[in-house]
């Protein structure tokens, strides 16, 4: 490590809370468009009743995101973080706007052609997700834990916000013609605005915050090349004072980083296998008919999102933060008792039990994810933290792909399942 850089930022360094707010907004933007797609799934089920939109969208989205992040994680040390993240948010903005254009062009009618174009736009969301998520997790991993926690909390907040907006729009337009479509259009317009806001914040605000400049200079002093464009955007052109001594910048290879953190990687994989095998497809298609009617699935999704958000903020309370690696593994494995619990509750239980199980699923997903993502980078140099962050995102998306695929098993035995 270059002289003059300590393990922690000076206490009087300005911009920490501003950076936390920006990271939270960036986290919202990284998932808001996709969560909007999931939350307005009731509209797409109305337009495409025979095509399982929620399951198909996730089956398209996640494998593309996984394939993209695997390529980017392999090449992360040679890719400008700034260009990568801005490209992702710009792609989110354009793709979300195209959903509005598509719906206006087709006037909300179904058809296989409309569905194929819709699935193509969903694929672009997967590409944007991997570009943004891996880049930001890697970038924030080399900074203080509060920033990555704020980003992860923002990701959870995206789900909570979309659920609130969906419930409001459904209630507001319930008695009007094309109520679902009107609500969906409002959603997509808000999503487009949020993604554009993220482009502006990351391009012009975030790189100029003192705490961000400090950690990026520190990473550059440890041999990171991915932060050079960000430092230039902050007005730092002369990096001659940073260390170029290779003897001081010996870094672990990706394989070594993965072996040292294999438990964290596998735990993240298992978390998202379980979560995505249940959410959202099971909640839309396997929870039966209840007195709440078509509000039921929306309430379940909202419940998951709110408890997921709560779980992501819980580690801010020190005694609630799990840091013991064995305890984390036990907690992750214990969650798998939820599988039979969901099965029997869907078959024999009432809505109260289902809401409780969904709450547990959301709470544990958010809490365990943030605990792992904040403790994993500890003790590594900046470039190693960036590489590790990208690797962990690979396992998150890998778990999501497997979970989505396993989610189709819930349809076995159902009439008109396929």
From Swiss-Prot:
TM segment ranges: 20-40, 54-74, 85-105, 108-128, 147-169, 186-206, 264-284, 291-311, 326-346, 353-373, 392-412
Organism: Arabidopsis thaliana (Mouse-ear cress)
Membrane topology: Multi-pass membrane protein
Keyword Transport: yes
Name the record gives this protein: Equilibrative nucleotide transporter 4
Gene Ontology biological process terms in this record: nucleoside transport
Function: Nucleoside transporter that can mediate uptake of adenosine, uridine, guanosine or cytidine when expressed in a heterologous system (yeast).
Tissue: Expressed in leaves and at lowe levels in stems and flowers.
Subcellular location, record wording: Cell membrane
UniProt entry keywords in alphabetical sequence: Cell membrane, Membrane, Transmembrane, Transmembrane helix, Transport
Similarity comment text for this entry: Belongs to the SLC29A/ENT transporter (TC 2.A.57) family.
InterPro entries: Eqnu_transpt, MFS_trans_sf
Signal peptide per UniProt: none
PANTHER family linked: EQUILIBRATIVE NUCLEOSIDE TRANSPORTER, EQUILIBRATIVE NUCLEOTIDE TRANSPORTER 4
Inducing or repressing factors: By nitrogen deficiency and 5-fluorouracil plus methotrexate.
Pfam families per UniProt: Nucleoside_tran
One Gene Ontology term of the molecular function aspect: nucleoside transmembrane transporter activity
């Amino acid at each position: 490590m270059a002289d003059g850089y300590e393990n922690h930022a000076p206490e009087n360094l300005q911009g920490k809370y501003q950076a936390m707010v920006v990271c939270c907004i960036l986290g919202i933007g990284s998932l808001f468009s996709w969560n909007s797609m999931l939350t307005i799934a009731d509209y797409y089920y109305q337009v495409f009743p025979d095509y399982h939109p929620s399951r198909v969208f996730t089956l398209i989205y996640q494998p593309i995101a996984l394939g993209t992040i695997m390529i980017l994680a392999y090449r992360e040390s040679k890719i400008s973080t700034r260009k990568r993240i801005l490209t992702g948010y710009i792609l989110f903005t354009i793709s979300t706007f195209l959903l509005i254009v598509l719906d206006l062009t087709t006037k909300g009618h179904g058809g296989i052609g409309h569905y194929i174009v819709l699935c193509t736009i969903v694929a672009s969301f997967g590409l944007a997700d991997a570009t943004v998520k891996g880049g930001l997790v890697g970038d924030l991993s080399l900074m203080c834990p509060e920033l990555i926690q704020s980003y992860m909390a923002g990701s959870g907040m995206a789900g909570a916000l979309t659920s609130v907006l969906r419930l409001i729009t459904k209630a507001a337009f319930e008695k009007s013609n094309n109520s679902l479509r009107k609500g969906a259009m409002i959603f997509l317009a808000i999503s487009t605005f949020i993604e554009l806001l993220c482009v502006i914040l990351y391009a012009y605000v975030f790189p100029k915050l003192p705490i961000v400049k400090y950690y990026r200079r520190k990473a550059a002093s440890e041999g990171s090349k991915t932060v050079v464009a960000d430092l230039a955007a902050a007005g730092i052109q002369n990096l001659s004072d940073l260390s170029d001594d290779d003897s001081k910048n010996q870094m672990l290879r990706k394989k070594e980083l993965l072996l040292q953190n294999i438990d964290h990687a596998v735990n993240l994989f298992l978390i998202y296998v379980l979560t995505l095998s249940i959410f959202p497809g099971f909640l839309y298609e396997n929870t039966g008919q209840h007195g709440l009617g078509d509000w039921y699935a929306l309430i379940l999704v909202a419940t998951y999102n709110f408890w997921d958000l709560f779980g992501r903020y819980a580690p801010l309370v020190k005694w609630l933060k799990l840091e013991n690696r064995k305890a984390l593994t036990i907690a992750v494995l214990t969650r798998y008792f939820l599988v039979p619990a969901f099965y029997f509750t869907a078959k024999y239980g009432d809505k109260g039990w289902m809401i409780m199980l969904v709450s547990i699923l959301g709470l544990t997903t958010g809490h365990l994810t943030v605990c792992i993502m904040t403790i994993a980078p500890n003790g590594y140099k900046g470039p190693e933290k960036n590489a590790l962050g990208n690797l962990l995102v690979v396992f998150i998306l890998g778990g999501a792909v497997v979970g989505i695929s396993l989610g189709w098993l819930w349809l076995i035995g159902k009439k008109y399942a396929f």
